[in-house]
């Protein structure tokens, strides 16, 4: 790429990041959705990676950048300057988290200001970024980015452990991979990665897992398109360990999208009779694509349906096992979805708990006597996890809690809770229930 083209691409990357961030901050949009929509328009994989890295860095460091802007700007930027404010934060992230060469970060960000149609503000952007370069950024509390109601709830639920949650949730999560051991072992895949110059490790607990030292685009993963590897956090991979399944068991994945857990179960148990549901038909299409990539010779029954509305999808034949990966607050995956802290509201938890209870009741009806239901969330809130399960056990005479080992996390009522960063995995809750014969 010629120098002029490289410079133009650098400006376009900063501009794309600013527009994504403005949509997240000021329009309440999902970071994941905005990245999915914007990144295909960025041609170079390195520029796509830069856009993504800037966005994540800004969201993780937003409290410090907000303080810096209040201190360094003569007057606050008006709401109409949302993209300009986001661009300044994108510049901060390049100097702070990403540690890019200052001349490149400043030049491209100032030019992006002009590309925004704000040439008169280019001098201000340059001056603020140079001050950031000289002075660094204000120190803020580890919990500064968390809504006050959520800070209080986590401290009430977990005491001193909450402080570690705040710290770990601000860190970058490692990239975990899952391999189908029937085709390739984790050790063999680590060797394949090494041939590509990618350093990775197997895991002593997770039998199908590989963890990268540094994240890479999936396009760089050998055999990804052929189903030799998938991206899946270690906590999510343990779902397959928790369910003891007969070879041809009838299994329901009640909230299946995007399909990683369904695909993992099929890799482990090729003869499973798997039914996968999701209330969103577009997300269910992702399940189909995931299974088609990883297990093209397997048959899965897909239903775009609300699992709680059994009359709409269930044929009355009971399942041997049910996986209910319930909709939740996502408070255990803030390091992967930092915009959760912007968008989550206290009254969301009431609605989520009610939905989880309805799903538990409905899925339980579809389970045969002697069958198992695995309830999981990526939440850290007791109301969604151990309190939810304890209430279900109290009102459900034929439900019995089954023990899970310490490899699933800390004892939490009838289940197990992992906190973010433990075993380098995401925050996650597991509860295994047996339906009495």
Swiss-Prot record:
Record CDD domains: AdoMet_MTases (cd02440)
Gene Ontology biological-process annotations: regulation of DNA-templated transcription; rRNA base methylation
InterPro entries the record matches: MeTrfase_RsmB-F_NOP2_cat (IPR049560), MeTrfase_RsmB-F_NOP2_dom (IPR001678), NusB-like_sf (IPR035926), NusB_RsmB_TIM44 (IPR006027), RCMT (IPR023267), rRNA_ssu_MeTfrase_B (IPR004573), RsmB-like_ferredoxin (IPR054728), RsmB/NOL1/NOP2-like_CS (IPR018314)
The keyword Transferase is assigned to this record: yes
Pfam families the record matches: Methyltr_RsmB-F, NusB, RsmF-B_ferredox
This protein's UniProt keywords: Cytoplasm, Methyltransferase, Ribosome biogenesis, RNA-binding, rRNA processing, S-adenosyl-L-methionine, Transferase
Residues of the signal peptide: none
Active site residues of this protein: 378
EC number: 2.1.1.176
Catalytic activity: cytidine(967) in 16S rRNA + S-adenosyl-L-methionine = 5-methylcytidine(967) in 16S rRNA + S-adenosyl-L-homocysteine + H(+)
GO CC entries: cytosol
Compartmental location: Cytoplasm
Binding residues annotated for S-adenosyl-L-methionine, in chain numbering: 255-261, 278, 306, 325
Molecular function terms from GO: RNA binding; rRNA (cytosine-C5-)-methyltransferase activity
Superkingdom to which the source organism belongs: Bacteria
Function: Specifically methylates the cytosine at position 967 (m5C967) of 16S rRNA.
Family affiliation: Belongs to the class I-like SAM-binding methyltransferase superfamily. RsmB/NOP family.
Alphabetical list of NCBIfam families matching this protein: PRK10901.1, rsmB
Protein name in the entry: Ribosomal RNA small subunit methyltransferase B
Protein species of origin: Xanthomonas campestris pv. campestris (strain ATCC 33913 / DSM 3586 / NCPPB 528 / LMG 568 / P 25)
Gene that encodes it: rsmB
């Amino acid at each position: 790429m010629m120098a002029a083209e490289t410079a133009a691409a650098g400006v376009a990357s900063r501009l794309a990041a600013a527009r994504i961030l403005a949509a997240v901050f000021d329009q309440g949009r999902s970071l994941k959705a905005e990245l999915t929509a914007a990144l295909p328009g960025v041609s170079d994989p390195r520029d796509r990676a830069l856009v993504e890295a800037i966005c994540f860095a800004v969201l993780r460091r937003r409290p410090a950048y907000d303080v810096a802007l209040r201190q360094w700007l003569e007057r606050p930027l008006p709401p109409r300057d949302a993209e300009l404010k986001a661009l300044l934060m994108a510049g901060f992230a390049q100097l702070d988290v990403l540690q890019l060469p200052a001349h490149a970060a400043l030049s491209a960000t100032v030019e992006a200001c002009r590309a925004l149609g704000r040439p008169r503000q280019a001098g201000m952007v340059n001056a603020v970024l140079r001050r950031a370069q000289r002075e660094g950024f204000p120190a803020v509390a580890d919990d500064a980015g968390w809504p006050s109601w959520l800070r209080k709830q986590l401290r009430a639920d977990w005491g001193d452990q909450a402080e570690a949650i705040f710290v770990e949730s601000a860190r970058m999560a490692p990239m975990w991979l899952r391999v189908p051991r029937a085709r390739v072992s984790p050790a063999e895949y680590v060797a394949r990665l090494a041939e590509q110059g990618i350093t990775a490790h197997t895991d002593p607990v997770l039998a199908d897992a590989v963890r990268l030292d540094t994240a890479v685009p999936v396009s760089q993963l050998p055999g990804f398109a052929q189903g030799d590897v998938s991206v899946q956090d270690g906590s999510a991979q343990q779902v397959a360990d928790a369910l003891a399944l007969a070879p041809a068991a009838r299994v329901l994945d009640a909230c299946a999208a995007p399909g990683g857990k369904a695909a993992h179960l099929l890799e482990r148990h090729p003869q499973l009779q798997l039914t996968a549901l999701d209330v969103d038909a577009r997300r269910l299409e992702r399940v189909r694509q995931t299974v088609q990539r990883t297990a093209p010779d397997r048959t899965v029954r897909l239903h775009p349906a609300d699992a709680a509305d059994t009359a709409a999808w269930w044929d009355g034949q009971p399942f041997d096992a049910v996986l209910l990966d319930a909709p939740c607050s996502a408070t255990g995956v803030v390091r992967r979805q930092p915009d959760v802290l912007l968008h989550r509201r206290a009254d969301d938890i009431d609605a989520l708990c009610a939905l989880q209870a309805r799903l538990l009741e409905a899925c339980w009806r579809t389970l045969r006597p002697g069958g198992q239901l695995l309830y999981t969330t990526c939440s850290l809130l007791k109301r969604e996890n151990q309190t939810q399960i304890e209430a279900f056990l109290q009102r459900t005479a034929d439900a019995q809690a089954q023990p899970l080992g310490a490899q699933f996390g800390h004892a939490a009522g009838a289940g197990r809770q992992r906190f973010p960063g433990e075993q380098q995995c995401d925050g996650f809750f597991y509860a295994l229930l047996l339906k009495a014969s």
